[in-house]
């Protein structure tokens, strides 16, 4: 049945298929069960990938198992050897996320090269800054599941402000954060790491951490968060990075971004619209890594967000300005292009919450030859269409 479904999807223009072996992909608590693909045998997965290889079409994308990031080199090697063997045997391009700063980062980058040398195709997906959760008092906080906090957070904002301003109430709320049990999986905020949680004043440059501001003010980090919320009418955003996916410094990030077999494209925003905002990694690349750090030339930066991903995913009709290619074009000012601070919107069905992030410095966006955005405003033109692929990646 699975084989027939896969072939039908490829015939309909699917780019390939994905699977998750990550223990972090779980159903919401209290269920907390892993997604179904987590239990699939490696033999079953290999059979599907090899079937796709026989068609000469498709890319296989994998959310990898924890063994790939194990602190034990032997465990990492076994996981990498198995994946490389599949890439060579099937002939299918295989792609997965390579977070900078992980114990398995260097091994994964080396595997990209050794796979190519062995005759396989493999490319890694990288990030310009690392996956983070965007938290706020208008949105989601790590403490919201605790009874003491849930009671307060269910109140209107005016009532919440009174409680967050009351010294005795603040003590109770701070105490609750010390004893509560935090979520460990799924798409929910993790336990606070105040040394790795940043107060989002800028969407480009480095921001102070909650821990740094707490030390300056000589108060508990949770009190800093309350104070900043009160000072900003609850609009202040906080970014908490996953310590397993965030680079410790610029050099670690550049090691993944500069590798010739990686694509700057890793994002989880589509799955977690109210918690994660990675759609700005392209403007972040141009603002931070190209303009501010000058780690890449403008031409290199543009190629990283156009031709490189197009070729990796098998789209030979776009990603470059030439006669006959699809006219998907952004016209931007290199001196000002940058992501803006995200905002929280309630425009999903039933008023559900999502994060929205705009950019500045983009003068016009052209989709299939139609100007769809001009100076940040939608023109009414709808040039986009569902992308279909009939060829595998060529990296």
Regions found by a protein language model. Name each.
Residues 2-28, 33-34, 38-40, 44-53, ...:
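Active-site neighborhoods of metal-dependent hydrolases
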Residues 237-248, 253, 297-302, 310-344:
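Acidic, glycine-enriched loop/beta-strand segments at the rims
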Residues 53, 88, 117, 215, ...:
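Hydrophobic alpha-helix feature that most strongly marks membrane-spanning transmembrane helices
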Residues 251-262, 281, 331-385:
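C-terminal cap of metal-dependent C-N hydrolases
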Residues 386-395:
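Short, solvent-exposed cationic patches
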Residues 203-204, 310, 354-357:
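Short loop/turn motifs at secondary-structure junctions and domain boundaries
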Residues 13, 125, 218, 268, ...:
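Divalent metal-coordination and catalytic microenvironments
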């Amino acid at each position: 049945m699975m084989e027939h479904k896969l072939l039908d999807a490829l015939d309909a223009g699917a780019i390939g298929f994905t699977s998750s072996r990550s223990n972090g992909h779980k159903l919401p608590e209290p269920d907390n069960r892993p997604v179904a693909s987590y239990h699939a045998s490696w033999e079953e997965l290999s059979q599907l990938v090899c079937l796709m290889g026989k068609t000469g079409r498709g890319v296989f994308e994998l959310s990898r198992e924890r063994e790939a990031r194990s602190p034990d080199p032997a465990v990492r090697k076994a996981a990498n050897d198995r994946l490389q063997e599949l890439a060579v045997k099937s002939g299918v391009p295989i792609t997965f996320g390579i977070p900078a700063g992980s114990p398995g980062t260097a091994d994964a980058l080396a595997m990209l090269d050794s796979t190519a040398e062995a005759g396989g195709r493999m490319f890694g997906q990288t990030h310009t800054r690392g996956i983070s959760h965007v938290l706020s008092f208008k949105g989601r906080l790590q403490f919201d599941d605790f009874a003491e906090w849930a009671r307060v957070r269910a109140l209107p904002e005016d009532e919440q402000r009174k409680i967050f301003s009351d010294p005795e109430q603040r003590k109770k709320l701070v105490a609750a954060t010390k004893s509560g049990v935090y979520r460990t999986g799924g798409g929910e905020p993790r336990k606070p790491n105040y040394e790795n949680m940043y107060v989002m004043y800028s969407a480009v440059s480095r921001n102070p951490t909650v821990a740094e501001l707490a030390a300056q003010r000589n108060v508990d980090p949770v009190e800093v968060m309350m104070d900043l919320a009160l000072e900003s009418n609850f609009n202040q955003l906080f970014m908490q990075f996953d310590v397993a996916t965030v680079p410790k410094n610029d050099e670690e990030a550049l090691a993944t971004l500069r590798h010739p077999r990686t694509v700057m494209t890793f994002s989880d925003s589509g799955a977690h619209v109210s918690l994660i905002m990675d759609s700005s990694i392209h403007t972040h690349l141009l603002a931070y890594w190209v303009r501010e750090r000058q780690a890449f030339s403008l031409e290199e930066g543009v190629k990283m967000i156009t031709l490189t991903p197009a070729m990796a995913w098998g789209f030979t009709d776009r990603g470059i300005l030439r006669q006959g290619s699809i006219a998907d074009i952004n016209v931007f000012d290199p001196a000002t292009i940058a992501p803006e601070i995200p905002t929280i919107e309630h425009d999903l069905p039933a008023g559900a919450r999502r994060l929205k992030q705009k950019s500045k410095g983009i003068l016009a966006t052209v989709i299939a030859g139609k100007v769809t955005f001009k100076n940040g405003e939608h023109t009414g033109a709808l040039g986009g269409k569902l992308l279909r692929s009939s060829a595998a990646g060529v990296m």
